[in-house]
């Protein structure tokens, strides 16, 4: 007979009543895993561009009793009673979000950025309609028409790419594709594109072919809020985003628009079209994060994020690696490892072993398989939240280069602990608040 996997505090618990024990007493297995992850975050350098460190206030909201509340529907139009308090929270989130981005309508219920995108598709498209988005191989996102994603299965997906020499979006190619395919939806945005997007040009092309313009600003929303990245709000028909990444909130999504008719369709697509009850504890955490982003200090944070990423990218470039597009205008950079003859997978694993976390990433027109890649993606949002500045990012770049050279020379096993010690020393001066 298999041993019980039930938490110790529950194996002999009475069959009634809510367990009042704290997590460590109620479920040591989960508590240990969380404690170990806390240690990992404290002692490691986080360079994953889609990750960040939330405030204690955001964590507190996420862990509140709002997790107990069902609230299908929208404020003042719920299908359950007892919603006055969660209505107030959702109204706050909506008002703060619109204030933050200068939009008129907002839906804060999507559980993720992917579901925010799906809500737009459900609201504004029919199966088989044509969508035009950035190719995944050029830095796009799965939900913008990749064949393995529902967006590439339910719709006729056409992809535009980047110039093979500059790695910048080929706007003329995109315009030509738009004229030939007449997409119902034109998508701007991606997950590994390090340069500014020309929203005015996207708008011009969308108008020329009669397309709806959607901007997915999941990666750069916090930079828009901080005033260091152009806002898509004056140009796009509809905007989607996550609430984490550069916005430094809980994991979730939202949709913005200035069009009342689109807003009504989006609301119906989110509920009841895609989701049932919203996660009110997450919406509370979103409200907290939006409030934090409205503080003037957030503009300083956003400016430092971009400055730090440019320093990181330039130092890696000076150290002999290649940077796609030659640099960055935002919080992320894509590093081409081919000058060192190291794959993205090997680099990711080697760097994690010394305490630097990032992800393997395809470079434009990558000859390697998606699970191997020729590159890595680095980001500065999380480290900047810890307080890292340009000097720390120069040191981080040096640690990356030292590790990759050790991999190439076959000396990482001997060098690992010394490099790991220097990583711990660096982060010790910038403790997390939890």
From Swiss-Prot:
Mark the transmembrane ranges: none
A single GO molecular function term of this UniProt record: pyridoxal phosphate binding
Name under which the protein is recorded = Serine hydroxymethyltransferase 1
Enzyme class, broadest EC rank: transferase
Functional summary from the UniProt entry: Catalyzes the reversible interconversion of serine and glycine with tetrahydrofolate (THF) serving as the one-carbon carrier. This reaction serves as the major source of one-carbon groups required for the biosynthesis of purines, thymidylate, methionine, and other important biomolecules. Also exhibits THF-independent aldolase activity toward beta-hydroxyamino acids, producing glycine and aldehydes, via a retro-aldol mechanism.
Binding, (6S)-5,6,7,8-tetrahydrofolate: 136, 140-142
EC number from the UniProt entry: 2.1.2.1
Q: PTM N6-(pyridoxal phosphate)lysine: list the residues.
A: 245
- UniProt subunit comment: Homodimer.
| This protein's record includes keyword DNA-binding | no
Q: List, in alphabetical order, the GO biological process terms annotated in this UniProt record.
A: glycine biosynthetic process from serine; tetrahydrofolate interconversion
Where is this protein localized, as stated in its record? Cytoplasm
Signal peptide (residue range)? none
The record's section on SUPFAM superfamilies has: PLP-dependent transferases (SSF53383)
**Which pathway features in its UniProt record?**
One-carbon metabolism; tetrahydrofolate interconversion; Amino-acid biosynthesis; glycine biosynthesis; glycine from L-serine: step 1/1
């Amino acid at each position: 007979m298999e041993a019980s996997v039930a938490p110790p505090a529950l194996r002999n618990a009475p069959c009634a009543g809510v367990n009042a024990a704290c997590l460590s007493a109620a479920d040591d297995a989960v508590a240990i895993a969380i404690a170990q992850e806390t240690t990992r975050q404290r002692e490691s350098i986080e360079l994953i561009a889609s990750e960040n460190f939330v405030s204690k206030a955001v964590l507190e909201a996420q862990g509140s009793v709002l997790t107990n509340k069902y609230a299908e529907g929208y404020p003042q139009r719920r299908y359950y009673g007892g919603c006055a308090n969660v209505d107030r929270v959702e109204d706050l989130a909506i008002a703060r979000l619109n204030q933050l981005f200068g939009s008129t309508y907002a839906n804060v219920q999507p559980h993720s950025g992917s579901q925010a995108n799906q809500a737009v598709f459900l609201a504004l498209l029919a199966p088989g309609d044509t969508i035009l988005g950035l190719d995944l191989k050029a830095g796009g996102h799965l939900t913008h028409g990749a064949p393995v994603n529902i967006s590439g299965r339910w719709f006729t997906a056409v992809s535009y790419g980047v110039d093979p020499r500059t790695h910048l979006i080929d706007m003329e190619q995109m315009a030509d594709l738009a004229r030939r395919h007449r997409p119902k939806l034109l998508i701007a945005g991606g997950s590994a594109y390090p340069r500014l997007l020309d929203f005015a040009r996207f708008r011009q092309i969308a108008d020329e072919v009669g397309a709806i313009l959607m901007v997915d600003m999941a990666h750069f929303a916090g930079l828009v809020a901080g005033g260091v990245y152009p806002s898509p709000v004056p140009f796009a028909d509809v905007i989607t985003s996550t609430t984490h990444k550069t916005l430094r909130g809980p994991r979730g999504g939202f949709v913005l628009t200035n069009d009342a008719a689109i807003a009504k369709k989006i609301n119906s697509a989110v509920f009841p079209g895609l989701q049932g009850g919203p996660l009110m504890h997450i919406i509370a955490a979103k409200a907290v994060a939006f409030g934090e982003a409205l503080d003037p200090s957030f503009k300083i944070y956003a400016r430092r994020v971009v400055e730090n990423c440019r320093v990181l990218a330039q130092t890696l470039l000076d150290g002999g690696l290649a940077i796609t597009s030659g640099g960055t205008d935002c919080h992320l950079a894509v590093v081409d490892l081919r000058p060192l003859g190291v794959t993205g997978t090997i680099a990711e694993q080697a760097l994690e072993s010394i305490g630097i976390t990032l992800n393997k990433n395809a470079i434009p027109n990558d000859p390697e398989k998606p699970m191997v890649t020729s590159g890595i993606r680095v980001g500065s949002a999380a480290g900047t939240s810890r307080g890292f500045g340009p000097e720390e990012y120069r040191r981080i770049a040096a640690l990356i280069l030292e590790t990759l050279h050790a991999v190439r020379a076959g000396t990482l096993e001997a060098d690992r602990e010394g490099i790991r010690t220097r990583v711990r020393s660096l982060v010790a001066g910038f403790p997390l608040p939890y």
